[in-house]
Swiss-Prot record:
The gene is panB. PANTHER family: 3-METHYL-2-OXOBUTANOATE HYDROXYMETHYLTRANSFERASE. It is found in: Cytoplasm. This is 3-methyl-2-oxobutanoate hydroxymethyltransferase. Homodecamer; pentamer of dimers. SUPFAM superfamilies: Phosphoenolpyruvate/pyruvate domain (SSF51621). Mg(2+) binds at D44, D83, E114. Catalyzes the reversible reaction in which hydroxymethyl group from 5,10-methylenetetrahydrofolate is transferred onto alpha-ketoisovalerate to form ketopantoate. It catalyses: 3-methyl-2-oxobutanoate + (6R)-5,10-methylene-5,6,7,8-tetrahydrofolate + H2O = 2-dehydropantoate + (6S)-5,6,7,8-tetrahydrofolate. The active site is at E180 (proton acceptor). GO terms for cellular component: cytoplasm. Belongs to the PanB family. It comes from Gluconacetobacter diazotrophicus (strain ATCC 49037 / DSM 5601 / CCUG 37298 / CIP 103539 / LMG 7603 / PAl5). 3-methyl-2-oxobutanoate binds at D44, S45, D83, K112. GO terms for molecular function: 3-methyl-2-oxobutanoate hydroxymethyltransferase activity; magnesium ion binding.
Length: 276
């Protein structure tokens, strides 16, 4: 049975930490579900992690639907949340149209929107229409040209604004909120003030749960990972080694072997070659 937003919300008073992870395709969704990840995020971060863009801004609604549909097909238990991408919810009408497409065409169970009090009316309207919404505050990548890619809300006024935004989203009906790259102390204070779950990324250990990017925690990309990510494996190195071995065996003629080949009866081959 699939996890519901009510199950997720019940984890907070029960003291159960929520593990959330991005997934962008069918294989990653299958593996994440087998590992027991309760909530998967089809983030617009796929623009960078999968498509090679420098930002999330080029990601379209069609991109999100295509990837989210694949993730949903790979799950039967995990709650699947999808981002609405840049400027697809600038107005209430846009948000409703975008939400309808993603919910109907991809089959996700919830949507994530970036922004605070300014989008609270949109969040309220979507929830009234039966669309579960997760908020996203702090570093909001769709606003990186105005906010920058840095830790947010270090100063008192900014911190107060973030808390007010979180309360506004909760009041509008958001079932949970992601806090990205905010000071640990502030994230913990917001988590304590809210009744809904707060899921952190680069926001310290005081949140109700954590979300991380698939590629970061598996070490798929060479070089240094983001500071907030722990590399639980070095899958990228393992893949590279396997590919080198494949190239080497093809070039040396040691692959394929008899084990990877099929045979036919000699007389059948003869009849085929000599047929007029």
């Amino acid at each position: 049975m699939r996890i519901t937003l009510f199950d997720v919300q019940a984890m907070k008073p029960a003291g159960q930490r929520i593990a959330m992870l991005t997934a962008y395709d069918h294989p990653s969704a299958v593996l994440a579900e087998r590992a027991g990840v309760p909530m998967l995020l089809v983030g617009d971060s796929l623009g960078m992690a999968v498509h090679g863009f420098d930002t999330t801004l080029p990601v379209t609604l069609d991109d999100m639907i295509r990837h989210a549909r694949a993730v949903v097909r790979g799950t039967s238990r995990a709650l699947v949340v999808a981002d609405l991408p840049f400027l697809t919810y600038a107005t209430e009408a846009d948000a409703i149209a975008s939400a309808r497409r993603v919910m109907q065409e991809a089959g996700v169970q919830a949507l994530k929107l970036e922004g605070g009090a300014t989008i609270a009316p949109t969040v309220r309207r979507l929830t009234e229409l039966g669309v579960p919404v997760m908020g996203h505050l702090g570093l909001t990548p769709q606003s990186q040209h105005t906010l920058g890619l840095r830790v947010q809300a270090r100063q008192a006024a900014e911190a107060r604004r973030l808390l007010d935004d979180a309360l506004a989203l909760q009041d509008a009906g958001a079932f949970a909120i992601v806090l990205e790259l905010v000071p640990t102390e502030l994230a913990q204070a917001v988590t304590r003030r809210l009744q809904i779950p707060v899921i952190g990324i680069g926001a310290g250990a005081g949140c109700d749960g954590q979300v991380q990017v698939w590629h970061d925690i598996l070490g798929l990309f060479p070089g240094k990972s983001p500071r907030h990510a722990k590399r639980f494996a070095e899958i990228g190195t393992a893949i590279e080694d396997a590919l080198r071995a494949y190239v080497s065996e093809v070039q040396s003629g040691t692959f394929p072997t008899e084990a990877q080949s099929s045979r036919m009866k000699p007389d059948e081959l003869s009849r085929a070659l000599n047929a007029e």
